[in-house]
From Swiss-Prot:
It comes from Burkholderia lata (strain ATCC 17760 / DSM 23089 / LMG 22485 / NCIMB 9086 / R18194 / 383). Residues 4-191 form the Flavodoxin-like domain. The keyword Ribosomal protein does not apply. FMN binds at residues 10-15, 79-81, 114-120, 135. Binds 1 FMN per monomer. Keywords: Flavoprotein, FMN, NAD, NADP, Nucleotide-binding, Oxidoreductase. NAD(+) binds at Y12. Substrate binds at W99. One of its GO terms (cellular component) is membrane. This is NAD(P)H dehydrogenase (quinone). The keyword Metal-binding does not apply. It catalyses: a quinone + NADH + H(+) = a quinol + NAD(+); a quinone + NADPH + H(+) = a quinol + NADP(+). Its EC number is 1.6.5.2. NCBIfam families: flav_wrbA, PRK03767.1.
């Protein structure tokens, strides 16, 4: 049975929502075990609450060592100036031991993201994230244009061939749209299908 981990960091809940729909898509594939976890928050709880960070997320916190237990990992992060969030970077910077062992070589890696604005760095966040995954020897999976949501021109929407994305709005008030969640589910399903093939 293939094992898929959806691992995310979310400040205000947008990436959390996307992660839940990524996991839903992955769970639609028979014979795949899906786990949803998050990376640790690095901001002290009182300070996090003061700036509106959603600290009551249900997903358990992952450990670095457990990454080796999965056949595929789908990473989710908000964008920080065109890069992944510091919390995710801090977590990944602790994976040197896994790298030394080649523990992630040949496993699937995929990324989804959130930005505050329409041109807020979604694609650079995902493609710069890929650098870390490639150093680990992971096999990168994105979202092909077979996913019809990528060519939706009827609304402002996230979604890239590199991975699912959402637009939070400058004040965080915009929630992931139906189209964005469809793309997220597609990505989760695609990764799970490929992981199942690789694990068989």
């Amino acid at each position: 049975m293939a094992k898929v981990l959806v691992l995310y960091y979310s400040s205000y809940g947008h990436v959390e929502t996307m992660a839940q729909h990524i996991a839903e898509g992955a769970k639609s594939v028979a014979g795949v075990e899906v786990t949803l976890k998050r990376v640790p928050e690095t901001i002290p709880v009182d300070q996090a609450r003061a700036i509106g960070v959603k600290v009551d997320q249900a997903a358990p916190v992952a450990t670095v060592d457990e990454l080796a237990d999965y056949d595929a990992i789908i990473f989710g992060t908000p964008t920080r100036f065109g890069n992944m969030a510091g919390q995710m970077r801090t977590f990944l910077d602790q994976t040197g031991g896994l790298w030394m062992k080649g523990a992630l070589v040949g496993k699937i890696g995929s990324v989804f993201a959130s930005t505050g604005t329409q041109h807020g760095g979604q694609e650079t966040t995902i493609t710069s994230f890929h650098t870390t995954l490639l150093h680990h020897g992971m096999v990168i999976v994105g979202v092909p244009y077979a996913c019809s949501g990528l060519v939706n021109m009827n609304e402002i929407t996230g979604g890239t061939p590199y991975g699912a994305t959402t637009l939070a709005g400058a004040d965080g008030s915009r929630q992931p749209s139906a189209n964005e969640l469809d793309i997220a589910r597609y990505q989760g399903k695609r990764v799970a299908e490929l992981a199942s093939k690789l694990a068989s």
